[in-house]
């Protein structure tokens, strides 16, 4: 069984969600191939994650269409991104790693 975070997502799904949020914020659109490129994975491995995020009500996704966050997905993505930023600051500034 995969470990889940406090929001019920696996770390991998959290990372996909943040990647979508960053792509939409910076480029206005997210597609499977954009997500695959940003994550360094093959497009075929992105689709199952997108289906799961859609089932959870976090994204709007149809094959061969743009991917967008739902309002709930945006809230979760922002929280995860903020958490990542706090951890980064801690490791870099406090622990000097």
Q: What annotation goes with each model-predicted range?
A:
Residues 85-97:
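Amphipathic alpha-helical dimerization/coiled-coil segments
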Residues 32-63:
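Canonical helix-turn-helix DNA-binding module
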Residues 1-2:
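Long, low-complexity, charged/polar intrinsically disordered regions in eukaryotic proteins
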Residues 65-84:
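Basic, amphipathic "hinge/linker" alpha-helix immediately C-terminal to the N-terminal HTH DNA-binding motif
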Residues 5-41:
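N-terminal helix-turn-helix DNA-binding core of bacterial DNA-binding proteins
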